[in-house]
Amino acid sequence: MAKGQSLQEPFLNTLRKEKVPVSIYLVNGIKLQGQIESFDQFVVLLRNNVNQMVYKHAISTIVPARRVRLPQQGEEASAESIVGEEESNN
């Protein structure tokens, strides 16, 4: 695995496995919402009413709808970090 993907892959994989709703902001400002169904080196497959293939180079930010816990590399499986939470104004 490339050094630059040491955080990206576990983050996306956790979002996929736990079916966490996400907001994906593209570099042109468009906001997409849905669940990550799959991903590879170049694309993320986002599922909502339809499936959308989003190229990673077009993504600015991925914001989970709730806190996500990731195991730290090189530490015990019980050690975890928390990745942000999207604020709701409802």
From Swiss-Prot:
GO MF annotation: an example: RNA binding
GO biological process: regulation of DNA-templated transcription; regulation of RNA stability; regulation of translation, ncRNA-mediated
Gene Ontology CC terms, in alphabetical order: cytosol
PROSITE patterns per record: SM
Family per similarity comment: Belongs to the Hfq family.
Cross-referenced NCBIfam families: Hfq, PRK00395.1
Function field: RNA chaperone that binds small regulatory RNA (sRNAs) and mRNAs to facilitate mRNA translational regulation in response to envelope stress, environmental stress and changes in metabolite concentrations. Also binds with high specificity to tRNAs.
Protein name in UniProt: RNA-binding protein Hfq
